[in-house]
């Protein structure tokens, strides 16, 4: 059903290469150097690199079903979240598989002390010369054509012994090109609308915490802080959460939350510089609304680096990589003991699904599922490109296509679209949605999505995958949020605003459950499409836009006249099942078993 790591095996994985005394299977083979890069000299043979090896899983179906069972209200296992030890035991490969890989690493010269066997993942440090022998490849520096100062060590092809081919799912960094770009266009980028020192309380013009409280029927509810109810905020791309701005925001817009605070967890040398002059709009928005509405304990997870990128027109490699380092953050979180995990994780970043290597996207989605198994509600903004921006596939055959987004397309995250206006709320044009080309439609979504497709008929046929996971799941206000950043009030828009607002509501629902001696909600989607459905207000006005024939980063692109996903009765691919009604949801979750 979901996360079929071995359900689609690329042709190159079946190719074997005859070498002296052995056979090898090519894992990845790029046909050419990616556009925007030039090959330079080989690195020093002594240069060290940290590799991450994803082990092929044997219990995928069992694991998926367990996650669904413990996340479906009414099931006998509902709320029985797994400990780290239980999860690792479930996912740990057969001993012979681990031994086979570990023996290969040691035989290849990988220092035993550098190998970390984490069951379904194995991490190790190796020199370039050893890596070249082990993977039967050559590494080179590759330089950015437009910015020669940016370079990275990569290869175009690597292989493993054929006896290991079904055990080694992925090794990186190898063929994954990409580079850091500061504040690039991500699918959940924020749009600064205007600056003001006196933001209006007119909720049709400016959104504040008070507006959201009234709109989503939260009233004056303020939860008591609970160490079991931590809300985590993801910080990428050199975004820093500034304490001075946060305190001033609470003073102006959420005085009832006076005394709220957040801590910082540094992942992979991530920083949270308080005196930086860099734009910090995303971090300010996320932390101010997550805590301005929830009063939960909060952790800002600041992560350095970037993830791998498969270039497309919206994110061509030479300038526009904004992929985030999900793996670093996920491995860190999953290493934590149960009491240190956040109950809710809100992330306001993403990219076009096709820009992420397919195996990388499946491996990452599996890790999101692991967080869900441990009781974490993983929430992502759906994106800000409507039905798509470039609307063109990035394969050898360039085909006009609506572009779904990732990680919103992962079935084990809850994706949040955007609305605007009140009385009634309306779908906003930039709210990303659609259907995944990588992940099949999960069973909990079948009825809701099929109902929409039946009404859609043949419209947009061939431009999307009708069997794919539908995006988003829910929605919330996403336009003209007042925030305090670098000493001033500004308003911003994007599904980046919708995600932390929705996450705060989930944190408040968790507080109600904990007070009733019940477990936190955990992975949300089976609840949202099931018993929780009546707690959402259906959005039936407005729609998304896109495919206008122009990409903000690459100029002329295919145009699809009147391309849109319309908000309609029931689930739709712009607002999901609708916006939350806290009053109704609170009654549902208080007694839910």
From Swiss-Prot:
Residues forming the catalytic site: 282, 286, 496
Superkingdom of origin organism: Eukaryota
Cofactors required: Ca(2+)
Main function: Secreted tripeptidyl-peptidase which degrades proteins at acidic pHs and is involved in virulence.
Matching PROSITE patterns: SEDOLISIN
Designated name of the protein: Probable tripeptidyl-peptidase SED3
UniProt keyword annotations, A-Z: Calcium, Glycoprotein, Hydrolase, Metal-binding, Protease, Secreted, Serine protease, Signal, Virulence, Zymogen
One Pfam family recorded for the sequence: Peptidase_S8
Residues with glycosylation annotation: 198, 204, 261, 275, 295, 554, 566
Signal peptide annotation: 1-18
Residue numbers binding Ca(2+): 538-539, 570, 572
Record-level GO BP terms: proteolysis
Residue ranges of every copy of the Peptidase S53 domain listed in the record: 206-592
Gene Ontology terms: cellular component: extracellular region
UniProt cross-references to InterPro entries, sorted A to Z: Peptidase_S8/S53_dom (IPR000209), Peptidase_S8/S53_dom_sf (IPR036852), S53_propep (IPR015366), Sedolisin_dom (IPR030400), Tripeptidyl-peptidase_I (IPR050819)
Catalysed reactions, semicolon-separated: Release of an N-terminal tripeptide from a polypeptide
Localization per Swiss-Prot or TrEMBL: Secreted, Extracellular space
Prodomain positions: 19-198
EC number assigned by the record: 3.4.14.10
UniProt remark on cofactor binding: Binds 1 Ca(2+) ion per subunit.
GO molecular function, one term: serine-type endopeptidase activity
């Amino acid at each position: 059903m979901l996360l079929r790591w071995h359900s689609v095996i690329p042709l190159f994985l079946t190719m074997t290469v005859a070498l002296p005394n052995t056979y090898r299977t090519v894992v990845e083979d790029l046909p050419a150097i990616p556009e925007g890069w030039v090959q330079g000299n080989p690195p020093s043979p002594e240069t060290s690199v940290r590799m991450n090896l994803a082990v092929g899983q044997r219990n995928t179906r069992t694991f998926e079903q367990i996650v669904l069972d413990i996340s479906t209200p009414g099931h006998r296992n509902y709320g029985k979240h797994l400990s780290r030890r239980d999860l690792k035991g479930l996912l740990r490969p057969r001993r012979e598989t681990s031994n086979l890989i570990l023996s290969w690493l040691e035989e290849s010269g990988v220092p035993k002390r550098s190998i970390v066997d984490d069951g379904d993942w194995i991490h190790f440090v190796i020199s370039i010369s050893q890596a070249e022998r082990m993977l039967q490849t050559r590494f080179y520096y590759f330089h950015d054509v437009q910015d020669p100062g940016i370079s990275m060590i990569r290869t175009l092809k690597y292989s493993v012994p054929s006896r290991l081919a079904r055990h080694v799912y992925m090794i990186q960094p190898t063929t994954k090109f990409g580079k850091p770009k500061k504040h690039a266009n991500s699918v959940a980028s924020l749009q600064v609308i205007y600056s003001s020192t006196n933001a209006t309380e007119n909720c049709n013009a400016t959104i504040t915490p008070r507006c959201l409280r009234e709109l989503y029927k939260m009233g004056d509810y303020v939860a008591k802080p609970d160490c079991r109810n931590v809300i985590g905020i993801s910080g990428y791309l050199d975004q820093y959460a500034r304490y001075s701005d946060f305190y001033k925001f609470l003073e102006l817009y959420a005085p009832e939350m006076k005394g709220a605070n957040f801590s910082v967890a540094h992942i992979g040398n991530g920083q949270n510089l308080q005196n930086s002059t860099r734009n910090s709009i995303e971090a300010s928005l996320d932390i101010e609304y997550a805590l301005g509405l929830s009063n939960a304990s909060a952790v800002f997870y600041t992560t350095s680096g970037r993830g791998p990128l498969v270039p497309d027109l919206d994110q061509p490699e030479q300038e526009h990589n904004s992929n985030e380092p999900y793996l670093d953050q996920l491995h860190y979180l999953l290493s934590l003991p149960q009491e240190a995990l956040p109950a809710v994780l809100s992330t306001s970043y993403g990219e076009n699904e096709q820009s992420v290597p397919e195996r990388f996207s499946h491996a990452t989605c599996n890790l999101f599922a692991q967080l869900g198994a441990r009781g974490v509600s993983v929430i992502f903004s759906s994106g800000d490109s409507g039905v798509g921006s470039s609307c063109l596939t990035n394969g050898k055959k360039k085909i006009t296509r609506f572009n779904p987004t990732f990680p919103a397309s992962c079935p084990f995250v809850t994706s949040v679209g955007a609305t605007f206006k009140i009385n009634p709320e309306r779908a906003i044009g930039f709210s990303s949605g659609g259907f995944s080309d990588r992940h099949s439609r999960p069973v909990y979504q079948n009825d809701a999505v099929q109902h929409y497709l039946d009404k859609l008929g043949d419209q947009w046929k061939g431009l999307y995958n009708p069997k794919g996971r539908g995006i988003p799941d829910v929605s919330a206000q996403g336009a003209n949020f007042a925030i305090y950043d670098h000493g001033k009030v500004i308003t911003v828009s994007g599904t980046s605003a919708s995600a932390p607002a929705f996450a705060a509501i989930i944190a408040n629902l968790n507080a109600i459950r904990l007070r009733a001696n019940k477990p936190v909600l955990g992975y949300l989607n089976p609840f949202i499409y099931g018993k929780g459905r009546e707690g959402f207000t259906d959005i039936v006005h407005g729609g998304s836009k896109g495919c206008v024939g122009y990409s903000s980063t690459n100029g002329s692109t295919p145009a699809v006249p009147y391309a849109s996903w319309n908000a309609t009765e029931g689930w739709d691919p712009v607002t999901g099942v609708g916006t939350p009604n806290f009053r109704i949801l609170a009654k549902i979750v208080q007694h839910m078993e």
